[in-house]
């Protein structure tokens, strides 16, 4: 539906451009009929006075802003937990083993190690409000412990290390979601995979994300696309050791279509 709406906008804008082109082409054509009609054609062209030309330019600019814009004007922002060096060390070790098994992973590709709190697409020019909200919440939240306890293939056929959920992290995720959902883009299309999970689809329609509130499951994604048999084999043969770490900051990053980020564009420390 969203894609069709964008296409209709583009068609209307193109029609306006063609109309303007036709007007000026007719004026130019009338000047080239023959020398005997020069004065008449000049008169026809002069009918398009300066005011009309300016009006066309102004209307064209407005239409370009409205019809020429689309969903690319909006951004996916991931608001996430940043952990201490213990998390980095353990994820690095797992990623090294993945690489030894010829499995491409996110860490070796330069993606940021993080636990997503809330990921969605926002209205353009919302970043300032997102930063403001994150700063306020971080300044009221104490740093807390996290325990990663299992390595598992996700329902999206990727690989992740899962943390035990607790009151601290669930409350933080809920607070972030409630305070940021007002800035999200409302007409985003539901991802195909979400439609297979009715509860996730309901949450996506309400909050722009399927992984909030009762579906929040804290984890670090290790890879996003890989052969399932390779993942199964790795899990079977890898001796995963649970580890503890501490949530120390809340970060914001521009996310790709898979929710992954390569740069932290803003972060605010939690109360130590």
Where in this protein do the model-derived segments appear?
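Sec-dependent N-terminal signal peptides
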Residues: 11-19
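Juxtamembrane low-complexity tails/linkers enriched in Ser/Thr-Pro and polybasic
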Residues: 34-43
């Amino acid at each position: 539906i969203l894609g069709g709406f964008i296409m209709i906008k583009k068609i209307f804008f193109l029609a306006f451009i063609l109309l303007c082109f036709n007007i000026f082409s007719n004026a130019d054509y009338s000047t080239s009929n023959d020398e005997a009609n020069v004065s008449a054609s000049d008169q026809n062209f002069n009918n398009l006075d300066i005011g009309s030309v300016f009006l066309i330019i102004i209307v064209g600019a407005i239409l370009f802003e409205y019809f020429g814009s689309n969903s690319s004007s909006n951004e996916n922002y991931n608001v996430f937990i940043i952990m201490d060096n213990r998390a980095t060390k353990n994820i690095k070790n797992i990623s090294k083993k993945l690489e030894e098994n010829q499995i491409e992973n996110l860490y070796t590709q330069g993606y940021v190690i993080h636990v997503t709190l809330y990921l969605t697409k926002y209205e353009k020019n919302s970043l300032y409000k997102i930063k403001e909200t994150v700063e306020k919440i971080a300044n009221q939240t104490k740093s807390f412990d996290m325990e990663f306890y299992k390595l598992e293939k996700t329902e999206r056929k990727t690989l992740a290390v899962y943390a035990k959920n607790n009151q601290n992290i669930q409350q933080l995720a809920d607070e972030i979601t409630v305070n940021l959902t007002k800035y999200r883009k409302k007409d985003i299309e539901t991802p195909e995979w979400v439609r297979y999970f009715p509860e996730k689809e309901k949450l996506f329609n309400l909050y722009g994300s399927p992984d909030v509130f009762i579906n929040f499951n804290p984890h670090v994604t290790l890879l996003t696309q890989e052969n399932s048999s390779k993942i199964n084999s790795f899990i079977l043969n890898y001796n995963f050791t649970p580890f503890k770490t501490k949530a120390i900051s809340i970060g914001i990053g521009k996310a790709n279509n898979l929710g992954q980020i390569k740069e932290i564009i803003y972060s605010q420390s939690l109360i130590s």
